[in-house]
């Protein structure tokens, strides 16, 4: 565990609620867009820029996951983690993709597209919006001193996993000194620093507490097990009060 991740203070205090609770009021939630990227991938700079463009939409939460399998080609990605590569491999199976690759966009855990296929990405967003069902509600509340309470409630279509993705919001520049992008000041958008499993969930109510490191934000992801569809998301910022 790196010193950065060990600085992340989090507390999973799941409080099991009743087996069945009323569904929350129907409302549109953001769609989670994940980009699997690498600082060593020559096609990824353009995809990183497009991820930032997508995040300008009010109906999108965008995250950049750096995979580590490009690290053997001369440059070690400063954000890559094996856990992010494993997440992409789960999507490979659940979405029936022939191989892992970069840049790959995954839309709400339900569809994927290559980074240059912007029309396919936009179509997937539209399809997901049309097919989205209410049933899972994620709420976050800042409680001061950087602490947050996270509440998950409702009835997911299937047994689910709850994850906390901790990311550095906005644009970040990394000077690439080797590999296929050598000499490039590469722009990264919302790069993820940690992906933490909070637990399994089959419905009802669950509550967690989390504290984020300074300069980071968090996204709660509720999705089907083993890389299944996303059922709920909630974004929150580091609070310094």
Role assignments for model-derived ranges:
Residues 78-98, 111-241:
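Short, conserved sequence motifs used for protein processing/export or organelle targeting and
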Residues 108:
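Conserved residues at the C-terminal ends of beta-strands
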């Amino acid at each position: 565990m790196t010193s950065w991740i060990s600085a992340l203070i989090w507390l999973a205090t799941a409080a099991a609620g009743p087996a069945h609770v009323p569904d929350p009021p129907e409302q549109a939630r953001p769609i989670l867009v994940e980009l699997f990227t690498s600082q060593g991938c020559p096609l990824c700079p353009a995809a990183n820029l497009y991820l930032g463009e997508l995040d300008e939409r009010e109906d999108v939460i965008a995250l950049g996951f750096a995979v580590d399998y490009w690290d053997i080609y001369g440059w070690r990605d400063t954000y890559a983690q094996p856990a992010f590569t494993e997440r992409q491999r789960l999507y490979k199976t659940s979405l029936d993709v022939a191989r892992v690759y970069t840049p790959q966009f995954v839309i709400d855990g339900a569809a994927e597209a290559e980074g240059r296929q912007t029309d396919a990405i936009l179509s997937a967003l539209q399809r997901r919006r049309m097919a989205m069902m209410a049933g899972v509600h994620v709420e976050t509340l800042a409680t001061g001193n950087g602490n947050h309470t996270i509440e998950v409630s409702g009835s997911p279509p299937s047994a689910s996993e709850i994850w906390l993705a901790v990311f550095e919001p906005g644009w970040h520049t990394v000077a690439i000194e080797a590999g296929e992008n050598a000499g490039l000041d590469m722009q990264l958008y919302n790069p993820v620093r940690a992906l933490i499993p909070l637990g399994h969930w089959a419905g009802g109510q669950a509550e967690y507490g989390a504290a984020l490191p300074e300069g980071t934000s968090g996204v709660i992801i509720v999705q089907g097990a083993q890389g299944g569809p996303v059922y709920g998301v909630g974004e929150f910022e580091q609070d310094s009060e």
